[in-house]
Every structure is written in C-alpha cells, then in structure tokens.
Amino acid sequence: MIVLGIESTAHTFGVGVAQDQVPFILANERHTFVPQTGGMKPSEAARHHTLVAHEILRGALDRARISIRDVDGIAVALGPGMGPTLRVGAVVARALSLRFNKKLVPVNHGIGHIEIGYLTTEAKDPLILYLSGGNTIITTYYRRRFRIFGETLDIALGNMMDTFVREVGLAPPYIVDGKHKIDICAEQGSSIIDLPYTVKGEDMSFSGLLTAALRAVKKHNLHDVCLSLREIAYGMLLEATERALALTEKGEIMIVGGVAASGSLRSKLEKLSNDWGVGLKVVPTSFAGDNGAMIAYAGLLALKHGVHIDVKDSTIRPRWRIDEVDIPWRD
C-alpha cells in the first residue's frame, strides 16, 4: 500500500510518500515560507503554499519514482493549524482524490509528528514530549487515544522563543546552521536573571515568561536574557516531564516536533533520562519540523485500518486536539 501525504498546517507546504514495507518513506519534499519582516501572516503563508504546491507535489512523486495513479490514498493534515494554510492543503488533497478516484484520509498534524517518531526511533511505549512552534504537550498512548498529562496553558514553547528572538531583532531567520537564534544568543550569556517560572501540576505557562523577558531586555544584557529565558523555559518543561514520569512509570521518553532539534534541550533531557534510568528517543532532525512524510505515514496506518472519508466531510479543523483522535492501529 502507498499513501501520499500533504502538510500545510503552518509555514511549511510538504508532500511525502509512504509505503507499508521497507523503506517506509519514499519521499519527503517541502518548502517553508519565511516572512521578510515581522511574524507570519496566515494569508501570506497560504499564498506561498498555493504557489509552490505543484512543484512540491511533482518533486515528491519524482523522488518516489511513482505516478499519482500508483497511490492507494491521499492523506491530508486537516488540523490543527492556521485556517488559510490548512485550506490550501485540503483543496489540493480533495482535487487529487476526486480526479484520480483515491481514498481521502484525514490526519491530525500532531498524530503525524508522533507516528513518525515511533517509526524513526523505534520507541515502544514512551512518555511523549510533543514540542513545536504551536504545541507543547506531554502525552502517552492508552486505549486508542493519546492521553494528555500536561500542556501549555497559553502559547507553545517554540512560539514563545520565536516571538522573543523576532521582537528583539535577532530573527528572522530563526535557525542558523541548525541552531535556533535563542541558543546562539544564549551561548554568550553568563548570568541568570529573575524571570517568571510557572508550572501547575504538569501544565506550563510561557506567556508571562515571554512578557517579562521582553521587558528585561531594557535593563539587562541581551545574552543574559536569552540564557535566562531558555534555561527557565526548559526547566519548567523538565519539571513537568519528571512529574509525568513519576505518574506513568514509563521506561522511555520520546521527543517529537520541531523543538526536538534543539541540542541544548536534548542534553538536558539526556541527563534527566540518565537520572531516572529511562531511555531517550529523539526524532531525527529531518523529521522534526513539519513535513509531508509524517502525514503520509500516519495516513498509511489509518488507511490500513479502514480510516477514510468522503470529500464532503473533509472540513478543516484548526483546533483539532490529539486526544480527540481515535487510534485503531495501536491496539
């Protein structure tokens, strides 16, 4: 079975191809919208996706060395994400499904991140840290659902860091030579300043930390603020993770999502894992950020278990939570 997957939930338009035998991933093509100034405007990102969609789709099929007629299903991320960009991917997927008579498979973006993590890390039953620009979630699988133990109460960890470096003039670009600008800035910091630290049970709040850090730049060295922001944010995440480990007694931690590419976070989680005597599984950098391959692979798992929908039912879901998705393939 072969499934083509389309990702367009935020700044990246990606198309991947997955099959149910080794090698599982046949193609993973994408192009990311980078605003010249300020934050990302959904309408501008959607325009970008519309312009690159044909090229990325053609590139994925060529990379996989297949024709669209060879695929068994079209998987598409219907949420969560930004409405305008989600609609671009949905329109492309619907058109392909109707034109070539292919089954349409709805995929939750977060489930895509998690399933590509399982595939690439070979994790068995992990505590999952899903960390990206739009999500900060601590979860694990239980009885056909991913159950959330902790999450951000406001903005996500990745979004908080992106916003900070943009507001202080360090970005865009946000990533240079594989390092986030917050890490590059923090390398020259030497002192930790007092900033809000908010953990409630296994939930975290980052908005107050962001506001305080932006104010602190006026009184303190920027490098020290970067260092403090990063260390306090990661400290909050680690505390919540330890509480979830104590509760679930899992034997391994799996990190997925774009923030999984952070070397500084990885080193902290390696120490935490060693202290707790559990394994640490980190999704490869090539699959950490948003990509079409993860949608294709999650769609493949779903289609093999009979999950597909009519085009008329393919409404986008900008606030679609991972704990709302039935997972028939993990039992």
From Swiss-Prot:
<feature type="binding site">
    <location>
        <position position="113"/>
    </location>
    <ligand>
        <name>Fe cation</name>
    </ligand>
</feature>
<feature type="binding site">
    <location>
        <position position="183"/>
    </location>
    <ligand>
        <name>substrate</name>
    </ligand>
</feature>
<dbReference type="InterPro" id="IPR017861">
    <property type="entry name" value="KAE1/TsaD"/>
</dbReference>
<feature type="binding site">
    <location>
        <position position="130"/>
    </location>
    <ligand>
        <name>Fe cation</name>
    </ligand>
</feature>
<keyword id="KW-0012">Acyltransferase</keyword>
<dbReference type="GO" id="GO:0061711">
    <property type="term" value="F:N(6)-L-threonylcarbamoyladenine synthase activity"/>
</dbReference>
<comment type="function">
    <text>Required for the formation of a threonylcarbamoyl group on adenosine at position 37 (t(6)A37) in tRNAs that read codons beginning with adenine. Is probably involved in the transfer of the threonylcarbamoyl moiety of threonylcarbamoyl-AMP (TC-AMP) to the N6 group of A37.</text>
</comment>
<feature type="binding site">
    <location>
        <position position="109"/>
    </location>
    <ligand>
        <name>Fe cation</name>
    </ligand>
</feature>
<dbReference type="GO" id="GO:0005737">
    <property type="term" value="C:cytoplasm"/>
</dbReference>
<keyword id="KW-0808">Transferase</keyword>
<keyword id="KW-0408">Iron</keyword>
<dbReference type="GO" id="GO:0000408">
    <property type="term" value="C:EKC/KEOPS complex"/>
</dbReference>
<feature type="binding site">
    <location>
        <position position="262"/>
    </location>
    <ligand>
        <name>substrate</name>
    </ligand>
</feature>
<comment type="similarity">
    <text>Belongs to the KAE1 / TsaD family.</text>
</comment>
<dbReference type="InterPro" id="IPR034680">
    <property type="entry name" value="Kae1_archaea_euk"/>
</dbReference>
<dbReference type="GO" id="GO:0005506">
    <property type="term" value="F:iron ion binding"/>
</dbReference>
<keyword id="KW-0963">Cytoplasm</keyword>
<dbReference type="GO" id="GO:0002949">
    <property type="term" value="P:tRNA threonylcarbamoyladenosine modification"/>
</dbReference>
<feature type="binding site">
    <location>
        <position position="290"/>
    </location>
    <ligand>
        <name>Fe cation</name>
    </ligand>
</feature>
<keyword id="KW-0479">Metal-binding</keyword>
<dbReference type="InterPro" id="IPR043129">
    <property type="entry name" value="ATPase_NBD"/>
</dbReference>
<dbReference type="InterPro" id="IPR000905">
    <property type="entry name" value="Gcp-like_dom"/>
</dbReference>
<protein>
    <recommendedName>
        <fullName>tRNA N6-adenosine threonylcarbamoyltransferase</fullName>
        <ecNumber>2.3.1.234</ecNumber>
    </recommendedName>
</protein>
<keyword id="KW-0819">tRNA processing</keyword>
<feature type="binding site">
    <location>
        <begin position="130"/>
        <end position="134"/>
    </location>
    <ligand>
        <name>substrate</name>
    </ligand>
</feature>
<feature type="binding site">
    <location>
        <position position="162"/>
    </location>
    <ligand>
        <name>substrate</name>
    </ligand>
</feature>
<dbReference type="Pfam" id="PF00814">
    <property type="entry name" value="TsaD"/>
</dbReference>
